[in-house]
Amino acid sequence: MKIGILGGGQLGRMLIQEALKYDDEFYILDPSANCSCANISYFTQGNFNNKQEVIDFGKDKDVVSIEIEHVSVEGLQVLENKGVKVIPNSRIITIIQQKILQKQFYEEFDIPSPAFQVIQSSDEEIVIGFPFVQKLNTGGYDGKGVQIIKAEKDLVNLWDAPSVLENLVDIEKELSLIIAKNEQGEIKSFPVTEMVADPQLNLLDFNISPTQIAEDIQKQIDQIAEKFMKAANSE
């Protein structure tokens, strides 16, 4: 099977390394010739945000996937129409790319998430209470495009762009769960990890696994994960 991956970073490398036990060929599209995947795959240097380059790269592949969400959805939609299997599908990637769509997705499927307000510009009336977090609708990555507005005096710093304004959550610990599903409907959950972030950079510093959580918390995580999988399958 010929598997194409948009993006050649560390996540792509880990994916390929784990899959080397299978008889598949892996192809990478990435703008950097020195990306992490370049020396363990069939490498194509190119722009995964360019519609035509994504189409040209993926048209002869059996499966196309991503290791970064900032890719050309339009290109992936064309590939789907040509019969190429895109995982995750272009509809889910569209939701992943836009914070507003993410929040609306959670709301539609009753997936727990902090209260929020959507704005298109900084001129709109702010009705959500302080403190809140502003998250730019698109383009945020690795701590960028996110800021905390603590009080009314800080509104002068509000970015003038489509955004989600979200209640600031008093976090005890941040947990992460990876869950996978195959075409037969089998679901595999990997161990929950605790994510420890750098408070200044808003970047992941390190992960703790196994994490120490109560049984009732684990049950809530499992229920939310199951609800999310069902919602994603409906898209």
Could you describe each region identified by the protein language model?
Residues 27, 65, 86-87, 133, ...:
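Structural detector of well-ordered beta-strand residues that form the stable sheet scaffold
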Residues 43-48, 117-121, 149-150:
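Short acidic-hydrophobic, aromatic-tinged amphipathic segments that line or gate anion-handling sites
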Residues 51-60, 123-128, 156-157:
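Short amphipathic alpha-helix with an adjacent loop that forms part of the alpha/beta core around
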Residues 69-71, 137-139, 180:
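Short glycine-rich anion-binding loops that position phosphate/pyrophosphate groups of nucleotides
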Residues 145-235:
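Internal nucleotide-binding/catalytic subdomain
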Residues 89-146:
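A conserved helix-loop-beta module that forms one wall/lid of the active-site cleft
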Residues 1-92, 96-97:
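ATP-binding N-terminal substructure of ATP-dependent carboxylate-amine bond-forming enzymes
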